[in-house]
Amino acid sequence: MSITKVHARTVYDSRGNPTVEVEITTENGLFRAIVPSGASTGIHEAVELRDGNKSEWMGKGVTKAVSNVNSIIGPALIKSELCVTNQKGIDELMISLDGTSNKSRLGANAILGVSLCVARAAAAQKGITLYKYIAELADARQDPFVIPVPFFNVLNGGAHAGGSLAMQEFKIAPVGAQSFAEAMRMGSEVYHHLKILAKEQYGPSAGNVGDEGGVAPDIDTAEDALDMIVEAINICGYEGRVKVGIDSAPSVFYKDGKYDLNFKEPNSDPSHWLSPAQLAEYYHSLLKKYPIISLEDPYAEDDWSSWSAFLKTVNVQIIADDLTCTNKTRIARAIEEKCANTLLLKLNQIGTLTESIEAANQAFDAGWGVMISHRSGETEDPFIADLVVGLRCGQIKSGALSRSERLAKYNELLRIEEELGDDCIYAGHRFHDGNKL
């Protein structure tokens, strides 16, 4: 069944910035997808096409991307008469229409919106759920399905919040839960106790939340953040059952080969900046003191040697995000140089569902884990909930248990777990090996 109509429009993400929504019509009806956007974006990501007209939307308009869907991609898809279930063929057609290595002509935000819409339409044509369709595309096992461990970003710093805290995300992971539903309850309880502690220690405004729903108190150091998180976990009685993860996002504070943990201070003293080896020592001190099971982006996106040196010294999950940008060439290099052991997969970093699936399988084939991720500028579209189940990744991060654009993904996972019943398992402590369960 081919596509009969393609239409894009401007809608708004969770930060109030314009983004692209795409609708596709087939004989089965109308299907819709909305594209997210990031705040701390890697320089190697596919291009999110923005208008750049400072007089409208502060330069963040997406009218060019919308027009590219309506005037170039849509007509080409309809003319091609490609069946909606030909995901790879449709994605390859759009990549060919763009003709660049980073989707800078048409925009990854234009191409991805169509790609995700096509998957929804194809699942409907086949009469199966979206996660089952994605599993078919990825040639992933479906017996049983794996429900992921949620890594809740409960405390925000870095580019996602005000205050002086350099590191961007402090996450909790209910690995000791017996189900996703229980993980949600545990996460909710810890999050609310953390909010209470933040207000008690830093004042009423400390309960205000950042872009991803986590509290954003005016904290100075990672130790201050981790002490408060561990206290909240212990208050709930979940010691040993709820672990911790960190996303440093250090590319924003990488300067002249060193790392400036005081980068938010306008007159930061260069003598206090850390060398890669000193930063490694700092990470090791945190790993010894706190129940940390996952470190994302410990080093900057092109500091390859520091990544590979650090991986040899730890036995926790090391996630590559800005380093790899869901890009198969960079993933291959990271695998070859032994820089990490887990891929963070973001759909809009690469721009099509087909390439995202290929990136996940590339990581799995190397023995890596894969974590599915939202973006800081999110929408109500829950596509990544189906993606993480379809790919058997075993882990997802979609912010805190706050803000509806974050809960849209978690609530969809609750529905999927309930629907599957005995035909699914919760990844739990084996979150890194979801594809092997």
UniProtKB/Swiss-Prot annotation:
Catalytic residues at 212 (proton donor), 346 (proton acceptor)
- Enzyme kind, highest EC tier: lyase
GO CC terms: phosphopyruvate hydratase complex
Query: What start-end ranges are recorded for coiled-coil regions in this protein?
Result: none
What keywords does the record list, in alphabetical order?
Glycolysis, Lyase, Magnesium, Metal-binding
Annotated pathway: Carbohydrate degradation; glycolysis; pyruvate from D-glyceraldehyde 3-phosphate: step 4/5
Give an example GO molecular function.
Answer: magnesium ion binding
Q: Which reaction does it catalyse?
A: (2R)-2-phosphoglycerate = phosphoenolpyruvate + H2O
Q: Which annotated residues bind Mg(2+)?
A: 247, 296, 321
Q: Does the keyword Lyase apply?
A: yes
Record's signal peptide? none
Q: Which residues cross the membrane?
A: none
**Listed cofactors:** Mg(2+)
Which EC number applies?
Answer: 4.2.1.11
Binding residue positions for substrate: 160, 169, 296, 321, 373-376, 397
One Pfam family, please name it: Enolase_C
Biological processes, Gene Ontology terms: glycolytic process
Q: Does the keyword Nucleotidyltransferase apply?
A: no
**Family designation:** Belongs to the enolase family.
Q: Please identify the protein, giving its name as recorded.
A: Enolase-related protein 1
List the source organism: Saccharomyces cerevisiae (strain ATCC 204508 / S288c) (Baker's yeast)
